[in-house]
Amino acid sequence: MALLVTVLGLSIAAAAGASSVTQLILAFSLAWGLVELGLRTSLAPRLVGLARRERVLLVLVAVVPALEVASRRDALADAEGWRELAPRWVDRARLARRVAIAPPLVVAGRAQTFFVRAEGAGTVRVGFEGEDAIEATSLGHGVFRVDATPRGVDRSREDITVTISVDGAVHDARLLHHAPVPHPRGIRVGDQHALCFVSEESGEVFFGVLGALRSMPVTGGPAACAFVGGAIWVAVRDEPSLVTIAAEGSVAARGPAIGRGAVAMASEGTKLAIARSGERRELVVLDALAGSELGRARVEGVPLEVAFAGDRIVLTTRSPARLELRALDGALLASRDLVMPAAALAASPRAIAIATTAFDEAARDNLGNHFVEDQLVWLDPRTLAPTRVVPTARRTDRQDHAGDADRGLGPAALAFDDDARLYVAFVSSSELAVFSPDAPTRGVDLGDRFFGPSGVAIDGDTVLAGSAIDGALVALDRHSLEVTAGARVAPTNAELLREAPRLLQVRLGERSFFEGTRAGASCHSCHLGGSTDGEAHNIGGRVLAPTLDVRGLAGTAPFLRDGSYARLGDLHDVAVLEYRGYREPAGDRRATLEAYLASLPIPVSLADRDVVREQRGLDAFVRAGCAGCHAAPAFTTLARHPLRTIFPDHPGDAASSLDVPALRNLRGQEPYLHDGRARSLLEVLTSANAANRHGDTRALSEQDRADLVFFLETL
């Protein structure tokens, strides 16, 4: 009877196109009923008394409907939510181990902070393959912190085993391993056609001439370089002092300590201006050769770029989006609030230019709060008053839809020449364009050389353009825009396919992240450089939400505020469904986008280390009930909660849910919470938690809250 029910049930399911568990249950229930009916009729003896050969034949007949039902397993998985649950189960199982470590990603040569949960443990030591074990710092409540810069792992490995010794008992964990290829950024030009640029991803500084480039490892994350006095000066993100590279290639730390957290640097003569976002946000101005500090000033927002405009310094920030003009001693001379932060900056004594996705407040109000319109804005170098605004996105005959755009997308780097012409690298449409004060705009497609130029510099009659994504540079004649030379510092796609296929997946996913969609926007439009623009947007919804940083997402499924995306690769649907997809096919974009996003590490916190205060902060974290949802070691349980149970004043759909985020990399990510209501972490614990449902923060003293904020900023 079981055989008959199975055969008949599969046949009914196949014929009906069953694609859910409910439909399968109905099909087999109907089959069972029909067989029962048959057994009560004269057909029963014949069915029950089938010969062995006839039974085998019946089984073979069942193969066809079985295969038909099996072919719809993906639809079945989607209908029942199994596809969504699978990644979450995997990540939860990893975090639920008695001894667990997070994040699940090790980046070669990159400083990282890992957390281990080992309840009741006294001593924890963590060993990465090829490295001596590191003793972890106990923060209390079974939570341990490990600061490491793994260097001994074979760079070809895609995953590695990490050993965790807990009071002598050894536990193993398997973590993803990523060894980034060089990403040339921040091209600077010196005398006699010398150039330099940094690759923070691979921890290198490149220098020389285009046809004979050399590289030198610089620990701590080289963030920017500049030529001063015949030497190359390098600002390092994780180290407090500048690094210099002499002509013969020797390296030495020099000059006054500026503090950790350098993000940008510019030079003018012997002067250096460094923007930093470490334990403090500051602009530091030095006379490099004299070794003296000319000025140091606090900055309210998160610094993005810095440039000299003659005897003045221009600084761009996000959170708030702002353009600032400062004197050499750091004093604020003028400022201008922006609708969206500047994605690129160039300055000269005659003009300042920025690239942004929205400069005109009225246009943004009229066209929606997720409106993206790439624009170039020229401003007066004395008053910051705008003198010219040029939307750059445009449509060519390659597009089918009137609203589509495929040129002038994603201006990522700007440079002025001596004739006030502005050269613009468009990362999202792979082109270089020249905007002149008194001549038509000219441009050249660089797509046949590399994808996504993200750097540009002027060297006499030569324009240098570089692609961080493809690891390549070209030189162009400044007048004709013809390519005259090229160089490569990273492997080609063909070399990666042969030697490191996963790194090719990462590169192709990075391309999808920066590539413009038919609607003219890209992931980079809001997630500047993989981080955030610090603004609140919506994508197809009614409620604004702050842009999330996309670094450190590996192992934290599901994704987005409501957890509606089960896999990182599923975020590709945003580009397809909301922005009409891409013009060019590029293989399995889901898989490559997932590979890229999973390769992005959590930045090391640059907050001051104070173990005693961290321990007090974690204790307040536990007493307030934060660990109930944000449990170590990932500081999330990967659960969802109805929004109104936590924020009863939430104006959206009462059924809206909130995916519990991991509380890593919070420093400098304001605004906070699902709707950006908190402008600081302290507000998260006070005014933004008026109902006291987002943790029992009322039970904390003022000192407790200060310690808790300190702890959160170190994660």
Which functions belong to the PLM regions below?
Residues 83-98:
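Proline/serine/threonine-rich low-complexity linkers at boundaries of modular beta-sandwich domains
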Residues 185-186, 245, 321, 326-328, ...:
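Periplasmic c-type cytochrome electron-transfer domains
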Residues 28-58, 474:
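Cytosolic-side transmembrane helix boundary signature
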Residues 101, 129-141:
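Low-complexity "stalk/linker" and mucin-like segments enriched in Ser/Thr/Pro/Ala/Gly
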Residues 3-40:
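Membrane-embedded alpha-helical segments of integral membrane proteins
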Residues 50-72:
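Internal/C-terminal transmembrane anchor helices
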Residues 52-53, 89, 109, 113-119, ...:
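Predominantly soluble domains enriched in secretory-pathway, periplasmic, or organellar proteins
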Residues 65-86:
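Hydrophobic alpha-helical transmembrane segments in integral membrane proteins
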